[in-house]
Amino acid sequence: MVRRPSKATRSQPAPPAPRLRTHAAQARAWQRMLSGRRLDLLDPSPLDIEIADIAHGLARVARWNGQTSGAHIFSVAQHTLLVEVMARHRIGDVDRRLGLAIMLHDAPEYVIGDMITPFKAVIADSYKTVEKRLLATIHIRFGLPPKLPESVEKLIKAADRAAAFLEATRLAGFDADEALGFFGRPPALPPTIEGDYLTPWSADTAETRYLERFHKYHGD
């Protein structure tokens, strides 16, 4: 004979299933900086951003995934200084606000790295969202508007592409025609300037020169 469960037994609720913690719930969204700051990448605060951290990070992030010739990586810090040189060569005097905008145009890469264009296209939405939020916060920290005027963005982009052409052909193994299709042809630089800015510096040199140029525009 089959024994039926009693009414008391039937009325008892089943025990709850164990709650599984997802990877997202466990993920850490902040980066500890050498300054002691803790920067939340998803909700960054201007109070947690220091130029010393930016300079240190950018001087150690490689352009072109590190696929460049020379004794050192060609760092994002050195690239930034080359962009600033290209802008001055293009328009002459660079005022304080434009100079700051140029010096900070790749600043988010001190925490998210310099992702190469082909891979960036694969995860564009996620990467761009974090990058734009970080850049807006960095701008606020150093007295710039979160979103730059379109004219300023276009000028920086033109100087950035000119710098990329030189890096591609002098350091990254591109031939001129190949680079021309991607970046356009830049204005010529004096040989002494090109020789200096396209010879990869050590991380310490890149960090020092980046800070010197930044303080020229920021004034502190």
List the predicted regions and their residue ranges.
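Metal-dependent phosphohydrolase cores
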Residues: 2-220
